[in-house]
Amino acid sequence: SSFNGEDRNPVWADKDTYYYLSEASGHFNVHKASLSSSQNVQITKHTQHPVRFLSIADDGTLCYGYDGGIYTLKEGGAPKKVEISVVSDKTDRDLIRRIQRSGAREIALSPDAKEVAFILRGDVYVTSLEYNTTKQITNTAEQERNIDFSPDGRSIVYASEREGLWQIYQSTLANKDEKLFTYATDIQEERLTQSSATSFQPLYSPDGKEVAFLENRSEIRVINLATKQVRTVMDGKFEYSYSDGDQWYQWSPDSRWILTNYIGVGGWNNKDVALVNASGNGEIHNLTQSGYNDTGARWVLDGKAMIWESDRAGYRSHGSWGAEGDIYIMFFDLEAYERFLMSKEDLAMLEEEEKAKKESEESEAGKDKDKKKDKKSGAKDKAEKDKVKPLEFDLENRLDRIVRLTRHSSRLGDAILTKKGDKLYYQATFEGGFDLWEQDLKENKTKLLVKGMGRGMMIQDKKGENVYFCSGGNIQKVSIKDGSKKPISFEALFDYKPYGERAYIFDHAWQQVKDKFYKEDIHGVDWESYRDAYRRFLPAINNNYDFQEMLSEMLGELNGSHTGARYYPDGPTLSTANLGVFYDESYEGDGLKIKEILKKGPFAIKKLDVTPGCIIEKIDGTAIKAGMDYFPLLEGKVGKKVHLAIYNPATGKRSQVVVKAISSSQQTELLYKRWVDRNRKMVDELSGGRIAYVHVRDMDSPSFRTVYSEILSDKNRNREALVVDTRHNGGGWLHDDLATLLSGKEYQRFVPHGQYIGSDPFNKWLKPSCVLMCEDNYSNAHGFPWVYKELQIGKLIGTPVPGTMTAVWWETQIDPSIVFGIPQVGCVDMRGQYMENNQLNPDIEVYNKPEDSLIGVDKQLEAAVKEMLKAADAAKK
């Protein structure tokens, strides 16, 4: 076909004629074409929805799906909808009651540390810390999240997405005699926000009078609980939310300020920490003022300082990925800073002096008090004592009062500083997974406290004795004194509503696209009409496989990349193993005839004496007959030893061998290396060793490190040109790193005593290069070739690449087996053109024909070598 768009699903009518689906009319329809003619005919004329699932019967009858129906079509006739009426008993239930003992996704600790609230499959629960008694607070098919306890412990605030809109809700103990949610008999819920804008991630102010929340995902707003008046604290233009839950802010102890992440103008990849006045007067202070990434600030030392994470000291990202972080502290108070820097000895002396002074003052004060003082005045004194004084900040010198707390940079999780400021507890990955580490800031010692803790937000109790966290669906309590860990058990009654839950996920996905799709006009589609068109199928869907298909079809109407839904059911009980060989498909006798043995596969051991041409006659004692389905013989044998009976026709000998079978992913890895080795060998042979070759497998850090290592190695750095192969790359985020690596211009040489030992820049490719690309380059594998061409680094060779350069968020649902994607960050060139749906054309267009691929011919690679030889010759002149 020749349509400059999408054609798919061809089916043969006869040896010359075929049918296929084409979007040439604006919607997928059935087209007819033949090998003997360049003409094609549109057979169906459907609009609004695409034709899908084209197939053909032996008698030439076409069958396809359209708008939820099945149609048939005979040559010369009109499409006929197949009337289907299925009579069946309803065996699936609308409500399934379960007891859940795991699956918690986030937690909030009550102020008295007697109970913990958590989210389980989108509902709010509270459980006792001593017993597994659990109270369900919400029971909806929709989703609740972002829980927080009020300072008095009598209310819980959370966000809930009901009727397609996230709003803030509060559940409160209605009976004044009841103190705990776990055992409460009367809990009342009220909706706090009444806006038409997305509102979630609420947090109580420490005085309990107000609740802060995010509106439209990045604007910080505050609602006064008494008056219900709402004010804006920080405009949303100063932050950007890529995925829900990625924002962070925290109230100050005096309820007057908020610490938050801050991008300012254009600082998406260089975040700072900002101090924001909670009154809504617009006062914002960028505290960190750094080109590095500074995030996740927490108030410490009663508001006199903050700790936060920064990647300024650790290993830098090598290929846009992999930067390591550290925990830092910034002081807003000189006295607190000087106290923090004291040695253990000096601090002990100071504390003794302070203790003596306090005792003296209390003694003097006691003499002046009336011994018959009534309870009312006593309560007044207590209230005055508990009153939090307004914080005062010395911000002018804050950058001179920064201390790095962690000794070793690493990938970090959460971190907590003790109330005295003498120890830091943090999650880090020094030894594989996330562990809990203790940094003694006075002794300058680091020790492992809890192995295999996992990664998650840690909550410290008021006494500072324990931390609570949720990881892997379980709630844990850890003593920071000795690292002992206690699971917090719960028994949550969960009402699973499969139909209601799928309806919620459908509406949620529709709304997420409306709110977050990278273009506000959603590519001009009538998104409202598509919701109605697809939602009508929900009552007939009783499983997630069909639901995922329907959701994907609706998302496919967006005409955008990175859309669609995925369903991840529980894996098969037994996975089928592989033997790492190609079989001779033309062989018709008993057994499996080996055509090729994959390098580094199970048979790639010399002592086995198994070569191409040998026949596998038996697998674990079972003979393989001609045409037999042998795959069941390998079920459940990944990583296990398999006993094989081998016959070698060349020698007439039979032998018994034992190999360790491999998984499909392991075999795919061997096939990939085989393909790369073949390409590298081909380039060496075609260029006589003058041209280097490298393949960029993915747009990620491991791939970048491979590319960097190979092209700057002694083997390749002295070659005259480079072929950068990006074919079949599925994307990631590496465009600028690769473009920078390949755009080096030599500006000086290092020559000690007449010997050339290197050039500057030494960390870039300095010679001609080209980029190979093909039809299935995707996402950032479209973005990098585009950047390469835009910066005029070299030529693109291969086939046109569809415009798919957007950044996606694949969101896992409350049913974690369902995931869907939203392309939400568009990339716009300096001419104002979005790269999405903007095809990238090569400078030299070359197609690899299927018949060439079957015999190992790669016309694209040949063209690249030819072009690089020209460039190498030109560079010599």
What are the language-model segments listed below?
Residues 1-8, 19-31, 37, 45-52, ...:
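A flexible loop/linker signature enriched in serine peptidases of the S9 family
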Residues 6, 41-55, 285-298, 406-413, ...:
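Conserved blade-ending motifs and adjacent loop-strand segments that build the rim/top face
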Residues 10-17, 54-60, 107-114, 147-155, ...:
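Blade-terminus and WD-like Trp-Asp/Gly-His loop motifs, strongest in beta-propeller folds
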Residues 87-104, 185-191, 391-409:
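A short helix->beta-strand "capping" segment at the edge of beta-propeller domains
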Residues 317, 481-484, 489-553, 557-558, ...:
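Terminal targeting/pro-maturation regions of precursor/exported proteins
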Residues 539-590, 652-678, 859, 865-877:
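Extended, small/polar residue-biased N-terminal targeting/export presequences
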Residues 574-627, 825-826:
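PDZ/PDZ-like domain segments forming the peptide/carboxylate-binding groove
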Residues 595, 602, 617, 622-623, ...:
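Cleft-lining beta-strand/loop regions that shape enzyme active-site pockets
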